[in-house]
């Protein structure tokens, strides 16, 4: 009785019977007034009831307060470091391709951001050496934290267009925003392309979220699809897709520990310069049910 207190109206979805809660004195039980309005319904075991407002007599005292017991979810920030080195000889060499130090800095930054992005997808929440003065922490990623998983292994890797539609309407858009982003692998993109040719008429929306997305409209919401380049490189992700509700995700970093370039990390007697990019960040996931993870989707029929 977290939400059903004395005065709450309950409806039996199977019979239409309306009941009013008259007492909520125990943690797991309710006393109700049956058959409001003069009906004469019976109630079966395991009948499904839902709350349909409340009704109180004139001059009544205030009802019992309802309870809200939120589930606590945690994650860690992870330290990412990408160093690069240029010898003093190379720095002093006039190269046709331009400044080597700048070139290596650009490449190192790309690798650094790729490391962070992959951790946001595939990282596993963990802490090692937790009792020491120098613990090592790993941030949990999307694929390891999302509990709304549609694994097609039990269906021989098959999900038809009708099954996909039902998953969107009944599961994926059941909670959260009416627009979500699907990052998918090449095989999943091929499945969706076949669906789109038959019915959906996909429309390209340019510049959204910094990438080009293809919009699929459904009765439940709009699915914005992007063939993720990382999923081409990561084994096992060609037949997978991660569906994200961005308002319920946050990139978190410690104060002063967002991505920065730290210069001159070389030893004092080293004939080279060494710099590194360093970030201490993690992923905050709110309302886990708003996201989804599809995997092992090999065929559509």
Q: Where does each model-flagged region fall?
A:
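Flexible, glycine/threonine- and acidic-rich loop/arm segments that mediate assembly and lattice contacts
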Residues: 1-5, 14-218, 222, 228-301
């Amino acid at each position: 009785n977290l939400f059903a207190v004395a005065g709450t109206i309950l409806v039996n979805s199977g019979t239409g019977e309306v009941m009013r809660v008259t007492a909520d004195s125990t943690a797991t039980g309710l006393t109700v007034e049956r058959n409001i309005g003069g009906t004469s319904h019976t109630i079966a075991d395991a009948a499904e009831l839902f709350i349909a407002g409340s009704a109180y007599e004139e001059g009544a005292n205030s009802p019992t307060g309802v309870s809200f017991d939120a589930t606590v979810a945690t994650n860690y920030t992870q330290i990412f470091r990408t160093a690069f080195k240029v010898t003093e000889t190379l720095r002093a060499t006039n190269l046709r391709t331009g400044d080597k130090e700048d070139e290596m800095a650009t490449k190192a930054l790309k690798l650094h951001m790729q490391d962070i992005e992959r951790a946001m997808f595939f990282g596993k929440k963990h802490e090692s050496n937790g009792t020491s003065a120098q613990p090592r922490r790993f941030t949990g990623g999307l694929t390891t934290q999302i509990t709304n998983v549609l694994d097609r292994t039990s269906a021989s890797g098959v999900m038809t267009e009708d099954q996909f539609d039902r998953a969107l309407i009944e599961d994926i858009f059941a909670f959260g925003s009416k627009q979500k982003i699907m990052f998918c692998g090449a095989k999943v993109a091929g499945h969706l392309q076949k669906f789109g040719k038959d019915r959906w008429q996909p429309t390209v929306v340019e510049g959204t979220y910094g990438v080009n997305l293809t919009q699929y409209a459904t009765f439940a919401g709009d699915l914005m699809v992007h063939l993720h380049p990382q999923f081409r490189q990561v084994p096992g992700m060609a037949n997978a897709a991660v569906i994200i509700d961005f308002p319920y995700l946050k990139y978190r970093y410690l104060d002063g520990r967002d991505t920065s370039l730290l210069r001159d990390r070389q030893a004092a007697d080293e004939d080279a310069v060494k710099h590194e990019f360093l970030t201490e960040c993690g992923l905050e996931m709110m309302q886990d049910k708003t996201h989804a993870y599809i995997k092992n989707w090999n065929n559509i029929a």
